[in-house]
């Protein structure tokens, strides 16, 4: 999927180890469209994309992303994550 919008927020780098022992680096960014009724989303950059992110608030970008879903341990609540895999 594609999403084009301007950057409204750039989060800090976050590092953690997964349950499988993999070290992961992430950074969240918020994008908003320039339409009459703007759409917005919180997108996650991982590893190299998160570390090498060199854009600024206000810049317009197009991202390609996947949607993943996870649940809490009880399986009663679902969370969606928008994972960027390319920035144009």
Where are the regions a protein language model picked out?
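Single-stranded nucleic acid-binding surfaces, predominantly the OB-fold ssDNA-binding core
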Residues: 1-88
């Amino acid at each position: 999927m594609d999403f084009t919008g301007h950057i409204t927020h750039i989060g800090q780098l976050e590092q953690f180890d997964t349950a499988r022992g993999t070290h992961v680096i992430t950074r969240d960014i918020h994008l908003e469209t320039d339409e009459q009724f703007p759409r917005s989303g919180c997108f996650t950059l991982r590893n190299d994309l998160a570390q090498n992110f060199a854009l600024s608030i206000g810049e317009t970008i197009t991202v390609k992303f996947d949607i993943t879903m996870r649940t809490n341990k009880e399986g009663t609540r679902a969370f969606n994550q928008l994972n960027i895999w390319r920035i144009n």
